[in-house]
From Swiss-Prot:
FMN binds at residues 131-133, 244-245, 288, 303-307, 329. Its cofactor is FMNH2. GO terms for cellular component: cytosol. InterPro entries: Chorismate_synth (IPR000453), Chorismate_synth_AroC_sf (IPR035904), Chorismate_synthase_CS (IPR020541). Reduced FMN (FMNH(2)). Its EC number is 4.2.3.5. The keyword Electron transport does not apply. This is Chorismate synthase. Belongs to the chorismate synthase family. It comes from the Bacteria. It is an enzyme of class 4 (lyase). The gene is aroC. One of its GO terms (biological process) is amino acid biosynthetic process. Homotetramer.
Amino acid sequence: MSHNTFGHLFRVTTWGESHGPSIGAVVDGCPAGIPLTETDLQPFLDLRRPGTSRHVTPRQEPDQVRILSGTFEDDRTDGPVTTGAPISLMIENTDQRSKDYSAIRDKWRPGHADYTYDMKYGIRDYRGGGRSSARETAMRVAAGGIARKVLGDGISIRAALVQVGDRAIDRSRWDWDEVSNNPFFCPDATTAALWEADMDALRRAGSSTGAIVEVVVSGVPVGWGAPVYAKLDSELAAAMMTINAVKGVEIGAGFGSAAMRGEDAADEMRMGEDGPVFLSNHNGGVLGGISTGQDLVVRFAVKPTSSITVERNTLDRNFEETVIETRGRHDPCVGIRAVPVGEAMAALVLADQKLRHAGQSAY
């Protein structure tokens, strides 16, 4: 199985399976001299951690990350700092319940990677999905914490859930402070309360639903990215598409641009006191694959969780028709915990872009 590494100069390789003894990552290309401890990474992992509300999987994992290499401390440093060597990260799995999957070991869950993994590799770890499980994203979040350190305090990466099922937020009520006040990372308190009832009904029905996550990055200077095949927006889109269950990505106005007229979609410019000023941001902070200095705006759609208790038709490994219902502990809406993962993927792309920009910029 190849392609477990993400990035160019700032690279992250993840390893491990949902029900294995541990999961981990190796971060390569991190500059030396950056202060780094586990406490810098843990807050981001706590946001993604399972078992935090009744609206996510009840699997109880503390997700305590350990830094095994790549940092050093002595009397000349103010705490551990990165050395430039690969940084190894590890999280132990402590609450596996593999017996929950014995009934589906030879059946393919509709909408899941079971079928394609079997067809490609001839073998799959059916316990929680193995490598295809969203459990792997914990290591992306940990690595994303390191990427944020590389980016520095001048760049802010925030994300929110803006739609669950067919119920979207009211953008006139958007409040970033509200995101940390509810279990959905929702910027609209009124809609978050409605989602509570929606999710309770879904859980009782044994079903699931999809969602849309919006990521907003502030502070990226003009000039990051490259034309043609290394466009900043194409790399952000590709990064979001690597997240489990993501089926669509848009930048700025995205698909809504198709309904606009040219004079409306183009972001007009004026000269301000400190330089050029854009009058709108329909292009999501990127033109020609290069950042404009405006906010980067990315949205991605997450399909409903495939593991549900509703009985469905499928095939087994002998290509015999059968029915399946998936027991175990699953997210009724995987989009909720995808919010911190979306932030992490944006951080990984931008840390890589920062290092690449340093070698290509005219300024």
